[in-house]
């Protein structure tokens, strides 16, 4: 029998955004970034109240179909807990549908909030599993849960009847690695951008990406001079360039100047990993073309603060 939690219990969740793929690590590599959403969740006597401020305000639903609410309910179910009602207030800073893990952050925030309300019965592994299930891949969600860089993977059942199993392990990241996000002023649909990908690739391209993922792991951990080589890719970015021409142009411009630039997630954000600041002139050119520039650091894991009634 599920435990009913006390009215008045409240948690505040701070969850980082993330960048997925990092070039070659399609649906595998992720990196938590220092742009954050904050979600306040309180148990109330009845009903559901949802407020959203910042990114997504006026665009996302304010009912039970809101992703944070759905994730809270999934987390409560996994924790074998019930609540009579919920008040959910979202303060969003992660750009929505821009390739910075906004939907994964929402799922992580919801599951983490439920875990805090229920006095933390869920493990990190369970939170990765529950939040990744909303995405269908674990790279963004795992980065937001664990912080830093992650290697993630998915196990599918042979018969296709069981739910996919998601897992991840953290990677140490050199302290001097920073991220610069060039965020265009338009949304990209992950589904639409995935539709342009081929169903099969050549063995030589697969081999190319396997080697670059290995290089990228070494670059993050101990050899940041290899970041440019480690962000090369043949599995998804060449195909997505046709539907994201502005992003592709910026990635190519930056890479031609020696910067480790890549398409962040499904885009449209172009991300640069470096140990030195990007020159002001380059960033000013981006801003003048209508691109928002975010100078970021590698972030830690999701944080949950419990406020007792």
Curated annotation (Swiss-Prot):
Protein name: Homoserine kinase
Gene Ontology MF, one: ATP binding
Pathway connected to this protein: Amino-acid biosynthesis; L-threonine biosynthesis; L-threonine from L-aspartate: step 4/5
PROSITE patterns on file: GHMP_KINASES_ATP
NCBIfam families the UniProt entry points to: thrB
Organism the protein comes from: Corynebacterium glutamicum (strain ATCC 13032 / DSM 20300 / JCM 1318 / BCRC 11384 / CCUG 27702 / LMG 3730 / NBRC 12168 / NCIMB 10025 / NRRL B-2784 / 534)
UniProt keyword annotations, A-Z: Amino-acid biosynthesis, ATP-binding, Cytoplasm, Kinase, Nucleotide-binding, Threonine biosynthesis, Transferase
Residues that bind ATP: 95-105
Uppermost EC category: transferase
PANTHER family named among the record's database cross-references: HOMOSERINE KINASE (PTHR20861:SF1), HOMOSERINE/4-DIPHOSPHOCYTIDYL-2-C-METHYL-D-ERYTHRITOL KINASE (PTHR20861)
